[in-house]
Amino acid sequence: MSTFWSGYIALLTLGTIVALFWLIFATRKGESAGTTDQTMGHAFDGIEEYDNPLPRWWFLLFIGTLVFGILYLVLYPGLGNWKGVLPGYEGGWTQEKQWEREVSQADEKYGPIFAKYAAMSVEQVAQDPQAVKMGARLFANYCAICHGSDAKGSLGFPNLADQHWRWGGDATSIKTSILNGRIAAMPAWGQAIGEEGVKNVAAFVRNELAGLPLPEGTDADLGKGKEVYAQTCAVCHGQGGEGMAALGAPNLQHASGWIYGSSLGQLQQTIRHGRNGQMPAQQQYLGNDKVHLLAAYVYSLSKNPEQVAKQ
């Protein structure tokens, strides 16, 4: 900001405060010391305005507000290029400096705790109740918006509290997913196999692989669906539908792990148009130590205490 505009803003601001002080005291000079029956000539629905001074507390509130404004402008930037003299902020307060200061204080306080758990394996951290509580708080802040407060997911977002893992449910895979994120793509097969192929494959997957009944009146050829599946789907999902963690291809034998729904119509929609999903990387936001705690919490969700203790 140029010197001219800085001075203009400062002069206008301070001049306004001075004018308000003058106005308050100038209008107070002619007031009577006590109450009076004299009215100001204003009447509204039978209510008349008397010529009495403001209550003292009201007057002092005006003064206090102006004094607060002056102190604020001394401590914080508000008068053009003036940076303020708030203690603890070299060169004046800014919201960035306040954020950096608070982060630094938090790192100083909690850093040793995170470092202690980072030196342990994810499996070991998952057995520590205090660490799991810390991980749960991190999960609530950073993960619950997609996966839900109970970590059971929703349509398009996987359940983290069951045994179905697209990218692997071991501690290393979970931590890698959180650190680096995951990008998955199910290609659209509608044009390649046609509408009949879509219906046949969907029926085969639901009935033969997942063992779910087909709706009454379903018009589909399971034999042809199996053939098309072997030609186009097995390369990712496996001949038996066991899935492939390296590609994030889900296990088709367990419908409870299908994040886009298991109805015949939803399966057809997935095969016909494909699906795209992305788990954002959290390393730049949380850092390795916090991700380590978070991974331990997620790891503990699908493991009962006995299973965790055996690791």
Swiss-Prot record:
It is found in: Cell inner membrane. It is a multi-pass membrane protein. Binds 2 heme C groups per subunit. It comes from the Bacteria. The keyword Cell membrane applies. The chain crosses the membrane at residues 4-24, 57-77. GO terms for cellular component: plasma membrane. Heme c 2 binds at residues 186, 233, 236-237. Keywords: Cell inner membrane, Cell membrane, Electron transport, Heme, Hydrogen ion transport, Ion transport, Iron, Membrane, Metal-binding, Oxidoreductase, Repeat, Respiratory chain, Transmembrane, Transmembrane helix, Transport. Residues 130-209, 220-302 form the Cytochrome c domain. One of its GO terms (biological process) is proton transmembrane transport. Its main location: membrane. SUPFAM superfamilies: Cytochrome c. Heme c 1 binds at residues 143, 146-147, 279. The keyword ATP-binding does not apply. Pathway: Energy metabolism; oxidative phosphorylation. Its cofactor is heme c. GO terms for molecular function: electron transfer activity; heme binding; metal ion binding; oxidoreductase activity. Component of the cbb3-type cytochrome c oxidase at least composed of CcoN, CcoO, CcoQ and CcoP. NCBIfam families: ccoP. C-type cytochrome. Part of the cbb3-type cytochrome c oxidase complex. CcoP subunit is required for transferring electrons from donor cytochrome c via its heme groups to CcoO subunit. From there, electrons are shuttled to the catalytic binuclear center of CcoN subunit where oxygen reduction takes place. The complex also functions as a proton pump. This is Cbb3-type cytochrome c oxidase subunit CcoP. It comes from Stutzerimonas stutzeri (strain A1501) (Pseudomonas stutzeri).
